[in-house]
């Protein structure tokens, strides 16, 4: 689905986000999105590490 979005579509989405939230809110939104992605990656890494360790114990 997202692979069909070209460069013009991406620009359109970014402009729509800018209009919706305004330039003052964008850094806050970006920061919270980054923290969310960081936490998600950390959780998935911990789950895979736990699963790998349990597999080695058996």
Swiss-Prot record:
Record's keyword terms, sorted: Cell membrane, Membrane, Protein transport, Translocation, Transmembrane, Transmembrane helix, Transport
Major location category of this protein: membrane
GO biological process, one term: protein transport by the Tat complex
Any single Gene Ontology cellular-component annotation: TAT protein transport complex
Location relative to the cell: Cell membrane
Listed transmembrane segments: 1-21
Membrane keyword on record: yes
GO MF annotations, alphabetized: protein transmembrane transporter activity
Its membrane topology: Single-pass membrane protein
Family of this protein: Belongs to the TatA/E family.
Subunit and interaction comment: Forms a complex with TatC.
UniProt name for this protein: Sec-independent protein translocase protein TatA
Source species of the chain: Bacillus cytotoxicus (strain DSM 22905 / CIP 110041 / 391-98 / NVH 391-98)
